[in-house]
């Protein structure tokens, strides 16, 4: 599946100037998408006002794309259909919150912009909107169909909800 998806994203990058599955979760502040595979797609993202990018996949974006720019960047090494640890999820959510608080719009992406992207966006909702994991998954799936693709990701979000409750005590 990944090879087919990668081929699709490369083809999409040749005929479109935007990454697959781009949408705002919070207009002008927080977005999700698939992997920007060309520099034109990367530029399109920046033209939308994105000032910070969180990559949630095995390989980071090309470092030369950031040369001379004022873009903040975080790479979370997470395998396809996997989920970050509780600590890494919390670090990502805090990073996103800090950037949004500094008026820097954030893009979260993985390869397809669904599973890992959806998990990080749902984790943000759990912490910042005080939602349960179930509510956050339902909300992100309504906004971005196909989000949170695996039991591993669903379980990680349930554990993250519990992790946050324990941290508050």
Description of each model-found segment:
Residues 113:
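Conserved G/P- and acidic residue-centered "switch" motifs that form tight phosphate/ATP-binding loops
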Residues 1-107, 120-169:
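Cys-dependent protein tyrosine phosphatase-like superfamily
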Residues 117:
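Ser/Thr-glycine-rich phosphate-binding loops at phosphate-binding pockets of nucleotides
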Residues 110:
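Short cysteine clusters
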């Amino acid at each position: 599946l990944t090879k087919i998806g990668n081929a699709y994203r490369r083809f999409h990058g040749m005929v479109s100037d935007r990454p697959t599955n781009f949408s705002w979760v919070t207009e002008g502040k927080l977005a999700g998408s698939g992997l920007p595979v060309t520099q034109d797609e990367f530029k399109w993202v920046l033209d939308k006002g994105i000032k910070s990018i969180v990559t949630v996949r095995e390989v980071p974006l090309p470092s030369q794309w950031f040369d001379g720019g004022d873009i903040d960047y975080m790479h979370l090494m997470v395998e396809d259909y996997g989920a970050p640890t509780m600590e890494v999820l919390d670090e990502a959510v805090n990073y996103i919150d800090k950037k949004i608080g500094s008026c820097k719009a954030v893009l979260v992406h993985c390869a397809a912009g669904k599973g890992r992207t959806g998990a990080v966006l749902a984790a943000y909702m759990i912490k910042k909107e005080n939602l349960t994991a179930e509510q956050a998954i339902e909300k992100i799936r309504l906004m971005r169909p196909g989000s949170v693709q695996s039991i591993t990701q669903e379980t990680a979000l349930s554990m993250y909800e519990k992790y946050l409750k324990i941290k508050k005590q």
